[in-house]
Amino acid sequence: MATTPRTFQLVAPHLTGEDIRAFQRDLSARFEAWDINHRVADDGDYDGATRDAAEQVCKGLGILHEKAMEHGVTPELRIRIRHPEQRTPQEVARSESASAKVFRAKLRERFKDAGKTLTGIDVSNHQPNVDWHAVKAAGHSFAFHKVSEGIGSPDREFGRARWKAMRDAGLVRGAYHFARPQKGRDPKAEVHEFLRLLEQAGGLDDGDLRPVLDIEDFGQAGRLTPEKTHAWAHGFVEEVQARLGKRPIIYTGAFWRDQMGNPDDNLDCPLWLAAFVKDPKPFVPRAWAHESFSILQHTDKGGCPGIAGNVDLNRLPGGQAALDRLRI
């Protein structure tokens, strides 16, 4: 049976008109998929909703808030959800009493540290000596380490001792694989190589970050067509899903646009965006236009206590809750 779409109303008085219009465009596709009409209202308050509707709105607010963080603003958010069915005043009161508590609790939990930005590093054999406790003491919350590249090229610095040291220092740790699809190998074989080397080092524990597919410029030699490259990435993602029960994080940047044709399909994976620019609104591939990036790698020439020389630095908007959503 068809249902009348619910109405979602948002108040964001601290945003400019152009920001609001940009948010409206970004949210449209997502809310249409949920059959929820949305608009910016001059005022709004909470009328009551089912648990399911509250869940949907919290998801929408999460997207909106992450967009707001990119603009450096914190919007004031108010919600009105109306149901089309006719109810008596007593029924409405009962609905509001129960569901408003659920909604407010979820909203408080979702945004308790949403304005915070966490930082982290990623390393490889280019950083042969790392004092992980110094990295943690410098304020970083997470760290990624390269494990493998293609097949037959393990990272020479990655191993059991370093993998354990990352965790022992109190960092949320993650591992990444540098893809070599132009070599013509089955993506399943690269997943096998990646996870085999990771398992030799102790494997993934509960609370580690999801594994990462690093897909970026791999030179002209043997370059695949955009369609074949995307198909290869899809095969890698599906094999990780089959092996671990989780979608990996995808690390990419302008490569997704320039050498993959900027496809719309993000393979249902979070984005770790590489954008070494000072622009507060870096290019985000079209496939993630409605979610934006989860992690931003903003420089490959950063500095960090405990590491000699340059190191990649990353920002993760949304605080601890956003970090937790990327963990296995």
Which functions belong to the PLM regions below?
Residues 27-35, 58-65, 81-85, 139, ...:
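Sec/Tat-exported extracytoplasmic proteins
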Residues 208-286:
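Catalytic domains of cell-wall/extracellular-matrix polysaccharide-remodeling enzymes
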Residues 6-95, 99:
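Short acidic, glycine/serine/threonine-rich helix-capping segments at coil-helix boundaries
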Residues 113-243:
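Substrate-binding cleft of extracellular glycoside hydrolase catalytic domains
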Residues 1-4:
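Non-Sec secretion/translocation targeting segments of pathogen effectors
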Residues 17-24, 51-58, 74, 78, ...:
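Extracytoplasmic/secreted envelope proteins and their assembly/folding machinery
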Residues 90-125, 133, 257, 264-328:
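Functionally critical loop-and-helix segments that line ligand-binding/catalytic clefts
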Residues 35-42, 66-69, 175-179, 204-211, ...:
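Surface-exposed patches in mature extracellular/periplasmic domains of secreted proteins
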